[in-house]
């Protein structure tokens, strides 16, 4: 009885301290594919009053169970721990049902029934369990260390990758993403600039059209002004010719007038001397005045002198009954006068129409029957007669 109670206590302890069954996905799977657990229905149930002896470590074929203990060197396999990131949504927990528990208990009881004949030492079993726990702790510690080392390696690798990326960007150029973003921004900027340039081009085309219209207008004005300038140039040339002709005509007239003036001055001197000689010994009826200032005064003076000489020589014969004589000669114009007439005719041909020359000679007074015949009468020949007169004689000499 004592032995049975000891076995019961160990069995209860063995059941409580038995390793839990591992499911799929905990990272400790065996490489063998999972096998279905077969439950033999022909096995007789174990009587509850017969307690099996404490069982030894028996290799189990159930999947997901970590087998610890002595392992031969031929069967050892090196496993590289690789960190696998599994999303939480992909992890499912498989909780064994009561039927599976019953099957596993039946399987263990069958094993215990088969090994009931072998009686082991409970201390040895306890020590084995402790060794298993220690190995599990050691394996967990090693796994944690491996995990920490792999984390450090991952961190170092991440830093190395970052540095390599920086070196690659520095050697190759900009970051492709940044380069793409920059190209996109430049494209948008170019689109905006293209639109602005399109608007400017439209405005410039309108301005160009307006300028072309203005150019046509100014071209027509220029052509018209050019025609007018040509006409004005021709008219200017004609006026210059006329001006030169008029200038030469005026110069000729002035030179002729100066010549006539000199001759009239000489005539005035001769008439004055003649009149003074005719009045010698008589009462002076004419006294020379100051020199005339102009040609008109000179002509007037000569005319008066001629009248005085005429009156002194011929008297007043035939003045009351003058007779007209037909014009025997036509007065011609001087070259300067002809040039002046030509210039006037060119300048104003309508006003300078040729008028009939009215160049009738002045009425010549022929001698008529007169009481006193003048000394220098054409019908008398007294030019060579000399009269001796004293200083006391006065008046005119009359030939009887």
UniProtKB/Swiss-Prot annotation:
Positions of post-translational Phosphoserine modification: 53, 356
Location of motif Tankyrase-binding motif in this chain is 22-26
Would I find Zinc among this entry's keywords?
Answer: no
Q: Name one GO molecular function term.
A: enzyme binding
Under InterPro entries, the record lists: Golgin-45 (IPR027095), Hsk3-like (IPR013183)
Per the record, the GO terms for biological process are: Golgi organization; Golgi to plasma membrane protein transport
Report if keyword Protein transport is assigned: yes
Q: Where is this region: Disordered?
A: 1-36
Region Essential for interaction with GORASP2: start-end pairs: 394-400
Residues annotated as coiled-coil are 126-263
Tell me the Pfam families matching this sequence.
DASH_Hsk3 (PF08227)
Q: Which GO terms describe its cellular component?
A: Golgi apparatus; Golgi membrane; nucleus
Could you state what the record's PTM comment says about this protein? ADP-ribosylated by tankyrase TNKS and TNKS2. Poly-ADP-ribosylated protein is recognized by RNF146, followed by ubiquitination.
| Keyword line | ADP-ribosylation, Coiled coil, ER-Golgi transport, Golgi apparatus, Membrane, Phosphoprotein, Protein transport, Transport, Ubl conjugation
Please give the name of this protein. Golgin-45
């Amino acid at each position: 009885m004592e032995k049975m109670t000891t076995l019961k206590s160990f069995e209860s302890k063995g059941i409580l301290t038995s390793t839990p069954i591992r499911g799929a996905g905990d990272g400790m799977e065996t490489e063998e594919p999972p096998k279905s657990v077969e439950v033999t229905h022909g096995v007789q149930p174990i009587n509850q009053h017969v307690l099996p002896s404490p069982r030894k470590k028996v290799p189990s074929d159930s999947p997901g169970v970590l087998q610890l203990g002595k392992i031969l060197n031929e069967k050892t396999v090196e496993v590289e721990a690789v960190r696998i990131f599994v999303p939480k949504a992909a992890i499912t927990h498989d909780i064994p049902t009561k039927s599976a528990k019953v099957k596993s208990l039946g399987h263990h009881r069958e094993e215990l029934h088969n090994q009931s004949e072998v009686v082991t030492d409970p201390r040895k079993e306890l020590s084995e369990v402790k060794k298993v726990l220690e190995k599990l702790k050691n394996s967990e510690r090693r796994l944690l260390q491996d995990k920490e080392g792999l984390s450090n390696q991952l961190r170092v690798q991440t830093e190395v990758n970052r540095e390599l990326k920086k070196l690659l960007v520095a050697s190759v150029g900009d970051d492709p993403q940044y380069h793409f973003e920059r190209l996109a921004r430049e494209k948008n900027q170019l689109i905006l600039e293209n639109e602005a340039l399109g608007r400017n081009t439209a405005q410039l085309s309108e301005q160009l059209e307006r300028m072309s219209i203005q150019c046509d207008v100014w071209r027509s004005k220029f052509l018209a002004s050019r025609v007018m300038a040509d006409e004005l140039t021709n008219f200017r040339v004609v006026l210059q010719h006329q001006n030169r002709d008029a200038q030469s005509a005026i110069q000729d007239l002035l030179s002729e007038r100066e010549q006539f003036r000199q001759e009239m001055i000489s005539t005035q001197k001769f008439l004055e001397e003649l009149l003074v000689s005719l009045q010698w010994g008589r009462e002076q009826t004419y006294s020379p005045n100051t020199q005339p200032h102009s040609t008109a005064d000179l002509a007037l003076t000569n005319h008066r002198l001629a009248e005085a000489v005429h009156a002194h020589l011929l008297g007043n014969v035939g003045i009351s009954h003058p007779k007209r004589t037909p014009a025997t000669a036509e007065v011609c114009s001087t070259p300067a006068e002809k040039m002046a007439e030509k210039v006037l005719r060119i300048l104003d041909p309508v006003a300078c129409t040729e008028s009939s020359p009215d160049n009738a000679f002045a009425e010549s007074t022929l001698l008529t029957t007169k009481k006193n015949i003048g000394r220098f009468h054409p019908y008398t020949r007294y030019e060579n007669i000399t009269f001796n007169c004293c200083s006391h004689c006065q008046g005119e000499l009359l030939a009887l």
